[in-house]
């Protein structure tokens, strides 16, 4: 019985490891295609990654960037909101959403997201002034 249990655990660990590598495969392929500006292939790979790992916020962020490049605003915003649902303090997603809301003249949401961005920024703090100027310029 102990031997069966031991083999079962080994089999489980090996299959879990293979499954994890398969997940990373699609994400890494997506990043590579995105880097090479092959956005259609990148989109497919990120979508495949999301099917396997629904909580990978990076895949949603890359999808948002792809939809932004392709001027597909509803999908761009939907993917940004998904990133923020998974990680409300994701600076890049907040920054992109703030810029979109300013562009859409939705200043109340842009301001509330900017207030959150100011509190949590650690990597993109230099963008605070840019957003502040955009809010001031477009609101007046």
Predicted regions and their residues:
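Canonical tetratricopeptide repeat
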Residues: 28, 62, 96, 130-134
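Canonical positions in the second alpha-helix
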Residues: 48-49, 82-83, 116-117
